[in-house]
């Protein structure tokens, strides 16, 4: 009888750990992700940010900042908003992907950078979206991606231009669009 109780408890604990402890699970819902008590990071300095302007169709101009300062995904997003009145970049075609990859490769030093996508799972269904709400109409996943137990964020590999699912708490350089 005691043994059964013990087994039941162990079962509960490991189920609990499985639920709470995996990397993707550390990420709370959407906006959150504040480390309590940690001050807001200062805006990137000029030396760690590189601005690029791309003329688009119909006279529209796209502006990007490549920030070589490693932040978690949600902090990067906040910095894009606070420091550039922008957002993490979304990518809608191959040519933009290439352009951003090349500049990110030259201007950042981690091999991967955050772009503005997140992947989440609802039971067996894994889906990705841009946090700026633009349509998810292009993707360039590396083989075996997206990977997602609960929620992951999208990183662009600066060597291949392919995208990988990364734990949102990882700290990476990032690309803002404004
Ligand atoms: C790719 O996307 C950018 C920005 O969304 C746009 O300005 C450009 O015209 C597109 N290029 C092609 C070849 O569709
Ligand atoms: C994808 O979405 C972007 C952003 O709204 C849009 O500019 C682009 O034309 C779309 N591309 C295709 C192929 O539908």
PLM segments and residue spans:
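N-terminal signal peptide
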Residues: 8-24
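Surface-exposed ligand-recognition segments of extracellular binding domains, strongest
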Residues: 112-151
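Conserved hydrophobic ligand-interaction patch in extracellular adhesion modules
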Residues: 73-108, 113-115
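Short, structured beta-strand segments at or near domain termini in extracellular proteins/domains
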Residues: 7, 168-178
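Eukaryotic intrinsically disordered and solvent-exposed regulatory patches
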Residues: 75-76, 99-102, 140-142, 160-164
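Classical eukaryotic N-terminal signal peptides for Sec-dependent ER targeting/secretion
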Residues: 1-8
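Extracellular disulfide-stabilized recognition modules
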Residues: 23-84
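Extracellular/periplasmic catalytic domains that process cell-envelope and extracellular macromolecules
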Residues: 56-59, 106-109, 121, 144-149, ...
């Amino acid at each position: 009888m005691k043994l059964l109780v013990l087994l039941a408890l162990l079962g509960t604990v490991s189920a609990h750990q499985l639920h709470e402890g995996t990397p993707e699970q550390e990420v709370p819902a959407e906006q959150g992700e504040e480390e309590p008590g940690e001050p807001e990071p200062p805006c990137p300095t000029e030396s760690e940010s590189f601005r690029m302007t791309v003329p688009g169709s119909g006279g529209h101009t796209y502006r990007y900042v490549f920030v070589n300062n490693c932040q978690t995904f949600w902090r990067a997003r906040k910095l894009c908003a606070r420091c550039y009145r922008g957002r993490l970049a979304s990518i809608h075609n191959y040519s933009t992907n290439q352009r951003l990859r090349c500049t990110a490769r030259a201007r950042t030093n981690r091999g991967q950078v955050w772009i503005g996508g997140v992947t989440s799972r609802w039971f067996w269904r894994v889906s990705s979206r841009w946090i700026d709400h633009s349509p998810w109409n292009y993707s360039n996943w590396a083989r075996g991606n997206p990977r997602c137990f609960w929620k992951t964020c999208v990183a662009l590999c600066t060597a291949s231009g392919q995208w990988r699912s990364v734990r949102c708490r990882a700290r990476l350089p990032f690309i803002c669009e404004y």
